């Protein structure tokens, strides 16, 4: 049993077919950021790994009202928030969402329809699998990837470890993962409880 593309589509609502997500590794990142976000990062806003610090996006795109009414600025703002979602949630690295991979910047350079044609679901699943493999190294203490996908998948596939949920009455067009938006209180650090429950499932 493992996470599949069907799970990604059902839980997150991301497309799992379309244009393959392949990022460039040789770009003028200052120019690429200027074209996509409308601002050029300062020297300190690049991580030593070459990735862009999320603080760059926070500095320029925190409040929608600062850009409302300016069509070009609204496009920059929206693309910045797509980048934030990718860098801190869907394709997060082990920095805990502090950095955004520059190789993804050119993928946001087209129109929104073009951006929507990428197979983001496939990229998210591939990225998560890679991080799950890497974290098996005993020297690693952190993990990148879409943790919320992994967590909701585990709750769905192993109901005994899931928090209590009210009856599900989905809104038209919403994906399955939305039903977990109502979860307010659960104990995430009960390691002993989860181990005992999983041991019981395996018997």
Indicate residue ranges for each PLM-predicted region.
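Structural stabilizers in ordered domains
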Residues: 1-203
